[in-house]
């Protein structure tokens, strides 16, 4: 009986923990949502730009912009990458500008040489800013790798998606924004 009690408490706590997790689990709609058309905050605080000179939102005004927060060892980011590549290839000629914000999760991910190698290995040709001190991350209120933000031609965040999935909806939002004046 004493041995049974030794198993019962951990089992009960595990079941309660699982129930709490299920209650707190976000709905499928929670990770993709239209934003309330708030002005984007920009890229101040980045330590280094790759594939471009530093860019500002003022320079990007008039373009539809996809901002992707990522880091090169994140499996979610690596799973999102082929879609970002497709959107860049398909929609850049129509005016889509992709900007990567590389925010490292681990110290080695912040080394410029490692980021350059990852950009080359992943065949990233769009501008990428390194955000080693999380200044851009925090200014945007970001919390996830990967996170996608779509900006309209006025520089306002009008759509956001956290994590993987819902690629058709994100692409539909890109198309909608590109069709808008």
Per-segment meaning from a language model:
Residues 26-57:
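N-terminal "domain-start" segment that seeds a small globular fold
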Residues 49, 70, 87, 137-140:
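Signature tryptophan residues that serve as conserved aromatic anchors
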Residues 55-78, 84, 98:
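Short active-site neighborhood of thiol/selenol oxidoreductases, capturing the structured segment around
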Residues 78-122, 132-138:
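Structural microenvironment flanking redox-active thiols in thiol-disulfide oxidoreductases
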